[in-house]
Amino acid sequence: MNDTVTIRTRKFMTNRLLQRKQMVIDVLHPGKATVPKTEIREKLAKMYKTTPDVIFVFGFRTHFGGGKTTGFGMIYDSLDYAKKNEPKHRLARHGLYEKKKTSRKQRKERKNRMKKVRGTAKANVGAGKKPKE
């Protein structure tokens, strides 16, 4: 059943500066719903002989009438480069990043402390307490 889905890549570019390959991905899926990103990652991994964990796909838009979806993809040389260069929200989608959430009260107190000072001193107040040495 998955044979009806075709993945094509275009505008392929090797970005040596960021240790990745980047491309536009066209997914042809006539008469079917939009293909999940996990499935696209797995198929790209087979095409480029790598593992799905270093592949990041995003920005998919299905064309009017369905049947064709276009998006963007990047394949990193290693997971370390991916963690270094990818935005945090994309890493979070893969489960590679967890944002630390401060409590509501702490955020409000910090905001009110910052209101009391002006200029460059604001950075010192916003930094919080210094760690004990």
From Swiss-Prot:
Species in which this protein is naturally found: Homo sapiens (Human)
Illness the protein is tied to: Diamond-Blackfan anemia 3: A form of Diamond-Blackfan anemia, a congenital non-regenerative hypoplastic anemia that usually presents early in infancy. Diamond-Blackfan anemia is characterized by a moderate to severe macrocytic anemia, erythroblastopenia, and an increased risk of developing leukemia. 30 to 40% of Diamond-Blackfan anemia patients present with short stature and congenital anomalies, the most frequent being craniofacial (Pierre-Robin syndrome and cleft palate), thumb and urogenital anomalies.
Molecular functions per Gene Ontology: RNA binding; structural constituent of ribosome; translation initiation factor binding
Glycyl lysine isopeptide (Lys-Gly) (interchain with G-Cter in SUMO2) cross-link, chain position(s): 37
GO BP: cytoplasmic translation; erythrocyte homeostasis; ribosomal small subunit biogenesis; rRNA processing; translation
SUPFAM superfamilies assigned to the protein according to its UniProt record, in alphabetical order: Ribosomal proteins S24e, L23 and L15e (SSF54189)
Name of the protein in question: Small ribosomal subunit protein eS24
Positions of the UniProt region annotated as Disordered: 92-133
Subunit structure: Component of the small ribosomal subunit. Part of the small subunit (SSU) processome, composed of more than 70 proteins and the RNA chaperone small nucleolar RNA (snoRNA) U3.
Keyword Nucleus among record annotations: yes
Cellular component GO terms, alphabetical: cytoplasm; cytosol; cytosolic ribosome; cytosolic small ribosomal subunit; endoplasmic reticulum; membrane; nucleolus; nucleoplasm
Protein family: Belongs to the eukaryotic ribosomal protein eS24 family.
Superkingdom in the source lineage: Eukaryota
Pfam family, one: Ribosomal_S24e
Keywords: Acetylation, Cytoplasm, Diamond-Blackfan anemia, Isopeptide bond, Nucleus, Phosphoprotein, Ribonucleoprotein, Ribosomal protein, Ubl conjugation
Phosphothreonine sites (modified residues): 9
